[in-house]
Amino acid sequence: MNIDKFTAHAKSAITNCQHIAAKNDHQQILPLHLLASLFNEDTGIIRTLINNSGGNLNILADQVQVELNKIPKVQVDGGGTIYSSAELLKVLQRADDLAKNNGDSFVTIERILEALSFDNTIAGKILTNNGISSKKLAASILQLRKGKKADTESAENSYDALKKYGRDVTELAESGKLDPIIGRDEEIRRTVQVLSRRMKNNPVLIGEPGVGKTAIIEGLAQRIFSKDVPETLINCRIIELDMGALIAGAKYRGEFEERLKAVLGEIKESSGEIILFIDELHLLVGTGKTDGAMDASNLLKPMLARGELHCIGATTLDEYRKYIEKDAAFARRFQPVYVSEPTVEDTISILRGIKEKYELHHAVRISDSAIVAAATLSNRYITDRFLPDKAIDLIDEACSRMKIELSSKPEELDELDRRIIQIKIELAALKKESDEHSKKKIEHLTAELEKLESNSYDMSSKWQAEKSKIQGQQKLKEELDRARIDLERAERDANLAKASELKYGIIPEIMKKIQETENADSKGLLKEIVSESDIASIISRITGIPIDTMLSSERERLLVMEQKLRESVIGQDEAIKSVSDAVRRSRAGIQDINRPLGSFLFLGPTGVGKTELTKALAGFLFDDRNAILRIDMSEYMEKHAISRLIGAPPGYVGYDQGGVLTEAVRRRPYQVILFDEVEKAHPDIFNIMLQILDEGRLTDSQGITVDFKNTIIVLTSNLGAEILVNQKEGEDTYKVKDQVMEYVKMVFKPEFLNRLDEIILFHRLNQSNIHDIVKIQLEGLKKILSAQNIILEFDEPALNYLAEKGYDPSFGARPLKRLIQREIQNNLAKMILAGEVSSGKIVKITAKKEELKIQIID
């Protein structure tokens, strides 16, 4: 007997039996220890053999443990030597003889089990007493191996390789576990056509992620099950190869190749009845490749070329080009079947087809408007993924959200129960008091508590009844699903009596019951129908784009948007109106979907409110004045700096980091983008903007298309400022627009200007405007001081003084800020530090005799 002729699993079993003996303080290793070790092996081979021979592994393992406990324990200080018994050596020798007699080069674990069944020791008796004879084991081994010989050290890995490393898709179709496949007839027909060829009958499905490549295979499996395929494929089974299971645990060199060869061998023996499906086909290229070893694709090539292997691959366009096309010999053995993204109409049909499966899983109902919304809204707003996958995800998440809400207590009932708890706590505290007021309060609260508890009981009963109704509906739908699967099976097996009973008796009866429960009073506490607004709400959460149904308060807010913006931007009514109209168009849903929500060029002198209006707009839309993407164009004066916006080109530092502009918009597609001081940038930068303004998209350095259709783009410039500054007070800006545009046309190309929604001129601020701005600035200071509990007051003379002294037509409102810092904030800072102004005091600002006075009132 040569121990080197035992397989790795057999050696492991022998080693483990030594550990079992040591653990139990036994001095000898007996066949019983070896049997216990075999029962612990993890390949599942022993369990299969025991089951096929009419035994039960769990019962046998318990009996072995009982016998192990009967063996006397010998405890030796410092540990003693454990000897192999003569019986054990006889069993191993018999296993070696059995292997040789059956033409095996290596002794496997099943031969050791067979050798134990011949044994007259306790181990052998346990097997025979449970009806597991050597003859039965020999027959089970033959059935398991299917005539294969053990000629490698890891021979056990090749048994039932397809079952171990594959998933039977046709079996899933038979048991009704696959979703129905709608459409894709052309792709399935082309796949069947390639599979029916004599040579190179291997289609590869190529398409973007999420377009339904795997679904086509499931559709083909369903057609094979229903015999809706040519005769050549009627008896075929589709087995999906599990690459993870194939690679996992392949420790030794050549073990992976051995497993793959075992899979291919079983497919070859099936005489064309097994079609191998390899999802993510590109993983085969290079898998298992080590020094001197072949990768998986090279093992497949001979069988693929000869037509001995029916194989369907699936991969994406990028990975097909990157991995498979580079290996021309591998690529030519496959016939590409291109799977395009379905249209919105096709997606709606697909969603209608799988609707029942999702309703059954989540125990909710899906309205048709939700299906249409999922297809149309996902196509419009989720641009970095593909239909139908992104639409199915929306439906799934909306159903999941509703299911969670259904299982939770309704908000109305929850508030009621919380109020009851609050009153009970209040009553417990009041009962300790004895005064008259407390007694009256107790009476009042007791009456309120009785009323609330009665309402809570009624509402809880109603809620429980509604939950029971929904659970009843769910059970009926599950029954209907099972009945339909049984009907398909009965029709396939030509069991006409059962088919007619199901078709004309059981199924109509269940459908009638479902209809009755659905038609019952639906105005309850629980909402169980997924609607269009639920889908819109999910998209809003994913993208940040507010497309869910507007509340009446938001509608009113949008109608008075100009007033809100005028609170912080003074004297620029024309600009405010243009921006407000753009926002209202987008929220009303009548905006051109292929362009940004609005694109504006703000022209005017410094300090008149160009940047301030952009901040006010961000504050209105997002409740955060800083929620804008501000790009200072003075940083892009050199030509090479332009690439920072879309990312560095390949080969340059920072290529993998993405662009400043594109990455920010990808992460937050709904925002205000401000290109400040745009005339200072290099002229070539406007070539990038042409695509954004016209098509609402831009491709970054890595080839990813970024969607700008939900952004508001604002460009500010000081071009023509001297004309606007010298304009007469109160004169309409349109009178000088032509003069300003001459300056603008000298800097910007006509194709750029033509793509802007509006070019807005900001006129210079007058004395009245400055007065209003002073008030806003002092209100801001008042808010800052209130945080320190200091009250700031100011009168009209102070406002007039600051407005008059801070007014400069050439510089707008900016000198005003410096004046307030100099005249008020500097003096206040000194007073606070000196302790003159402290918490609770009032600071009053007034003006007397052309001088600003700061008074402190206790």
UniProtKB/Swiss-Prot annotation:
Region entry C-terminal, spans: 765-858
PROSITE patterns recorded: CLP_R, CLPAB_1, CLPAB_2
Binding site for ATP 2: 604-611
Major localization listed first in the record, in broad terms: cytoplasm
Pfam families, sorted: AAA, AAA_2, AAA_lid_9, Clp_N, ClpB_D2-small
Region feature (NBD2): 554-764
Record region (Repeat 2): 84-147
Function noted in UniProt: Part of a stress-induced multi-chaperone system, it is involved in the recovery of the cell from heat-induced damage, in cooperation with DnaK, DnaJ and GrpE. Acts before DnaK, in the processing of protein aggregates. Protein binding stimulates the ATPase activity; ATP hydrolysis unfolds the denatured protein aggregates, which probably helps expose new hydrophobic binding sites on the surface of ClpB-bound aggregates, contributing to the solubilization and refolding of denatured protein aggregates by DnaK.
Sequence similarity: Belongs to the ClpA/ClpB family.
Record's protein name: Chaperone protein ClpB
Organism: Rickettsia bellii (strain RML369-C)
